Amino acid sequence: MGKEIKKVVLAYSGGLDTSVILKWIAKTYDCEVVTLTADLGQEEDLDGVDEKALRTGATRAYVEDLREEFARDFIFPMMRACAIYEGRYLLGTSIARPLITRRLVEIAHAEGAQAVAHGATGKGNDQVRFELASAALDPSLKVIAPWREWDFRSRTDLLNFAAENDIPVISAGNRKLYSMDRNMLHCSFEGGELEDPWNEPGPGSYIMAVPVEQAPDEPEYITIDFEKGNAVAINGQAMSPAAIIKTLNTLGGKHGVGRLDMVENRFVGMKSRGVYETPGGTVLHAAHRDLEGICLDREALHLRDSLIPRYAAAVYNGFWYSPEREALQALVDKTQENVTGTVRVKLYKGNVVPVGRKSPYSLYRMDLATFEEDEVYNQADAAGFIRLNSLRIQGYGRRS
């Protein structure tokens, strides 16, 4: 087992799990371990994480700022598609995995490694996402998933291994209440009291957004400018994709926007309960959707909308690097060519309320839509339209 693998590239956070994994792989496979720590805007202090990896046994430690790449090449394409899983989840965890895996594979090539490794458990979706992405990018690389191989079954087992191997960890008394995953788009919470779907999430699950009870009593109005479906400015100030997300996180989070508590269907077959905070993404999704209302032709909009579940499932299930997702993206991006304009949004007590929109490509005609007297639309013409559309269903209601 260990002879064929001489070097492994590990997705490394610096926490207990991946620190134990680093040492376990080095010992079990008798190989070199190179680590990758990706800054995806998770708001964690990554200073010293490379030194910790090296002290734990890594031969080289990469710490990379991938925030702009993450926002530009992964979040924004998904937002253009209005992707939302099971009608509710904005895919904050799912969309991060393809980028991390791509860098793992690229580093593996640069380092001459034979395998990549991750710390996802054998019960969740992330193992699938990492490994499908790796297979798509380089099927010759082996993927090591320690949670499916080793005998450890609890946090205590990991702590004991860490103590035996001089791996520095935080004390057990400081452990988090939940299993958490955070990046610039969202923060997710699972486990603990959340495993009972009847329990209300506790105060420890509020990191990016305040409880609505604590949100300001006055609404806040903002404007978001879009070009070809991508947000480019907030309140008239041009910003990079990552800065757009970060700014909207601050604005939305202050007003309690973007909280979601749901039971979802995992790709691996079980249901799981998760609590998600996606303040900036929720604001962006609502504003973009609203602008499409005046910019997109009806049939193009309806066609794209019919494909939202397919696109969202591709992201959720780990098929970012797939012919179907790329084909869907091509259709989506065609629809976005004229989604350019400005949306005015009101933020208040957990709500995102679009209250105004304008676009140089607007298909909305006030002279046609008016309820006042007009000289453009002959209302009598509607009679023939209705008559022709009734032919197919005439008498249908009498069949039963």
UniProtKB/Swiss-Prot annotation:
Reaction equations catalysed: L-citrulline + L-aspartate + ATP = 2-(N(omega)-L-arginino)succinate + AMP + diphosphate + H(+)
Positions contributing to ATP binding: A11, Y12, S13, G14, G15, L16, D17, T18, S19, A38, G119
UniProt cross-references to Pfam families, sorted A to Z: Arginosuc_syn_C, Arginosuc_synth
Localization in the cell: Cytoplasm
Keyword entries, A-Z: Amino-acid biosynthesis, Arginine biosynthesis, ATP-binding, Cytoplasm, Ligase, Nucleotide-binding
Residues the entry annotates as binding L-citrulline: Y89, S94, N125, R129, S179, S188, E264, Y276
SUPFAM superfamilies registered for this protein in UniProt: Adenine nucleotide alpha hydrolases-like, Argininosuccinate synthetase, C-terminal domain
HAMAP family according to UniProt: Arg_succ_synth_type1
Assembly behavior: Homotetramer.
Family, per entry: Belongs to the argininosuccinate synthase family. Type 1 subfamily.
Protein name (record): Argininosuccinate synthase
Source species of the chain: Oleidesulfovibrio alaskensis (strain ATCC BAA-1058 / DSM 17464 / G20)
Gene: argG
